[in-house]
Amino acid sequence: MRMRHKPWADDYLAENSHIVISEPSQYKGKWHSVFGNDNPIHIEVGTGKGQFISGMALQNPDVNYIGIELFKSVIVTAVDKVKQTEAPNVKLLNINANMLSDVFADGEVDRVYLNFSDPWPKKRHEKRRLTNHAFLKKYEQVLGGKGAIHFKTDNRGLFEYSLTSFSEYGLVLTFVSLDLHQSDFEGNVMTEYEEKFAAKGQPIYRVEAEWRT
């Protein structure tokens, strides 16, 4: 999908540096000090327009949330969502997911959320899928070999690929749903994409995968 350029995005992010952390690598190993507490840190890789992470922050004030989004044209909307909720326990990073280990120390993160990631269906693009082994290794590092990944998608092919990838990597699947909205799962916070898919009656797939020490 082509992202529409927003020439004012840089200035807007700079004006909201209390939400979008510039030069986040300087806080590696120090993220608890950024939030001013020792609460668990959960990250969302590909936070998009911010509805999920803002909703989670409101629902769970005792958890610190960090949303990671590569595209400035998208993260500016996430900034607006965070400002609207006035949630003090959420920060945003305008970085590539490949930089996780540059930004977080080993074991500094407690959970990783992946919501409606780009499926990259062509085989030659497999390395770009956020659930391939290369990315799992990055998550494992910042999670310190513990914690969990919570993954949601509307794409059956990506879901099946991810289940296999998680299992082959040695993760334990503790929750699997082939139709989340028809399950008894409680506390679900929907993304913008999820609302659209649900309105069309499309099933939402969800899995929780854990590292066991």
UniProtKB/Swiss-Prot annotation:
Gene3D superfamilies: Vaccinia Virus protein VP39 (3.40.50.150). Catalyzes the formation of N(7)-methylguanine at position 46 (m7G46) in tRNA. The lineage of its organism: Bacteria, Bacillati, Bacillota, Bacilli, Bacillales. S-adenosyl-L-methionine binds at residues 44, 69, 96, 118. It comes from the Bacteria. Residues 124-129 are annotated as: Interaction with RNA. GO terms for molecular function: tRNA (guanine(46)-N7)-methyltransferase activity. Keywords: Methyltransferase, S-adenosyl-L-methionine, Transferase, tRNA processing. This is tRNA (guanine-N(7)-)-methyltransferase. GO terms for cellular component: tRNA methyltransferase complex. The active site is at residue 118. The gene is trmB. Its EC number is 2.1.1.33. Belongs to the class I-like SAM-binding methyltransferase superfamily. TrmB family. InterPro entries: SAM-dependent_MTases_sf, tRNA_(Gua-N-7)_MeTrfase_Trmb, tRNA_methyltr_TrmB_bact.
